[in-house]
């Protein structure tokens, strides 16, 4: 993100502030999405946080700088913070716990590959077009598609299990004598 800001003439200090805001927003996104997932339908929670990211990317694509660019950074960070939480929660609801490890591992692997590809595409886009606008437009389009797909998810296939584990037995410690 810092490269996007400095490319647009933003000072190094403000670019560093944007990075700090992303970090703060990651925490808010992680905690906030986790809390909301306990009370609301997960695709709606994901739409809320990923919609914020889409808005932030669109603001950056529109060439916002100064305070709006800092707000855009925060919005992008919110979705970044919610990604793993919403992914794990929805996998458990739509694929169940029996296949959770496999499904989550595959999804997380794809998530990591997409993150690496995004960085490469951003760099390639800048090298080819001498601007971050084309890759940002592509990312905005991908986010809109993701939001549309999330809005089409139906009811959970697997509910919450309410199994209660028995209390642990006290451990007897020998005196060693």
Predicted segments, located by residue:
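C-terminal ends and interior cores of transmembrane alpha-helices
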Residues: 52-64
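A late C-terminal transmembrane helix in Major Facilitator Superfamily
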Residues: 94-129
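Cytoplasmic membrane-interface "Motif A"-like loop-to-helix N-cap segments
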Residues: 38-50
């Amino acid at each position: 993100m810092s490269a996007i800001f400095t490319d647009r003439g933003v000072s190094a200090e403000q670019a560093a502030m944007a990075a700090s805001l992303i970090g703060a927003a990651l925490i808010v996104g992680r905690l906030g999405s986790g809390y909301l997932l306990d009370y609301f339908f997960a695709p709606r929670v994901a739409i809320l946080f990923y919609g914020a990211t889409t808005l932030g990317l669109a603001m950056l694509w529109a060439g916002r700088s100064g305070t709006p660019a800092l707000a855009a950074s925060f919005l992008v960070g919110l979705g970044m913070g919610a990604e793993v939480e919403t992914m794990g929660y929805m996998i458990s609801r739509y694929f169940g716990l029996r296949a959770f490890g496999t499904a989550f591992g595959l999804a997380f692997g794809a998530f990591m590959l997409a993150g690496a590809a995004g960085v490469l595409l951003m760099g390639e886009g800048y090298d080819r077009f001498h601007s971050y606008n084309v890759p940002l437009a592509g990312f905005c389009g991908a986010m809109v598609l993701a939001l549309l797909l999330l809005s089409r998810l139906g009811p959970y296939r697997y509910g919450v299990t309410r199994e209660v584990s028995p209390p642990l037995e006290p451990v007897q410690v020998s005196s060693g004598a």
